[in-house]
Amino acid sequence: MASYDLVVIGTGPGGYVCAVRAAQLGMKVAVIEKNPTLGGTCLNVGCMPSKALLHASEMFEEAAHSFAKMGVSVSAPKLDLPSMMNFKQQGIDGNVKGVEFLMKKNKIDVINGKGKILGAGKVEVTGSDGKAQTVETKNIVIATGSDIARLKGIEIDEKRVVSSTGALSLAKVPEKLLIIGAGVIGLELGSVWKRLGAEVMVVEFLDRILPGMDGEVAKQFQRMLEKQGFAFKLGAKVTAVDTSGKMLKARVEPAAGGPVETLETDVVLVCIGRVPYTEGLGCKEAGIALDNRGRVQIDAHFSTTVKGVYAIGDVVAGPMLAHKAEDEGVACAEIIAGQAGHVNYDVIPGVVYTTPEVSSVGKTEEELKQAGVAYTSGKFPFTANGRSKVNQTTDGFVKILADAKTDRVLGVHIVGREAGEMIHEACVLMEFGGSAEDLARTCHAHPTRSEAIKEAALAVGKRAIHM
């Protein structure tokens, strides 16, 4: 019977990063993976493939609509969808091989099969052939991630009624695409297929898009998407999808009640969020407590209700983000090794990888108002940023929220080109408790889009230069 210092169940960003850090700290480590490839949802059917398609579809749209005004004449671009999907797969394969390399480099054993916790220190692994083996370990980390959330009464077949997984591998561009849910995943995948020629309708139960993001940012971003051709039905819900005919028929009704309408579409994408994945893990039998949303309950040190069993990532409370899982993986490994691992949950950025991008870190205006925190706001539009103007990519703005008394930055929100790359100077600033004044007095290279962040910091003190 194999014996380890640590066994990690799941090899997504949280799991494999936890395993690597534990190995760096001198532990004998094994990972258990039920899928044929390492990397979890993120690398195989999530973050990475969606970014490949977002990039490829953006290039397709740029060639069709933006090259001419820059003096670049090309014939009308022709879509080769199989080749685009191959481009996506090459990216997936490269990243998966990268994780495999990390396992070998750090002498981490990879055990293929489905893991089940038998109790403290014991994990049963059942392979695809049905044969089971038991692995002994001093510590266990649950990093099993999340699964797609499903709508009652709407069956996902991954062909015409699809989840995010199916939407990454459609055989052809649908003429009409109906998306249920106006969150990050739905808007990103909607952007891919809109650029490639689909007519996109988004139905959202709430009265706004991007729940949880700053309200002003969400409102402005919705207008930008509508200019791109997106259509929205907010405050509405899809209660049924008739798949019997050539066209799908979605039953849509107001969330507050009212007249029902039927929308015809080629493909329905169900994007209403994700749920923690604990199926077959043996939590109940092992005495590992779950909360009322199915998440593994942990304390401040990632410990579950069973000694020596820890949990991180999407399977526990908090935002379901790969980078949050990675940070938890590092912290958890360090805590197991007797060190002071830590995650600052107030400084976890979020990004929507559309065009333009949306990024944020820290508190929204709504959250500060609800908490009764006095704050000042500084805003700077990209229309007043030299680099954005000369590149003719002026959509969006930067908004900085700072404590009214101390000037400490509490939140930063960006909508605009490359917002996902720009947010990180705000993360560093906030990690060190920096103020808007600190940011305003930091020299920024010219001409860059990042100068808009400095100007927004200046605007907190009502002294922006270029506005």
Residue ranges and their predicted role:
Residues M1-G12, V173-G183:
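Beta1/beta-strand and adjacent pyrophosphate-binding region of the FAD-binding site
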Residues V7-I9, G115, T134-G145, I179-I180, ...:
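Short hydrophobic core segments
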Residues G14-C18, V161, G186-L189, R195, ...:
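Short glycine/serine/threonine-rich phosphate/pyrophosphate-binding segments
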Residues C47, T144-E199, V203, Q228-A231, ...:
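Glycine-rich dinucleotide-binding loop and its adjacent helix/turn
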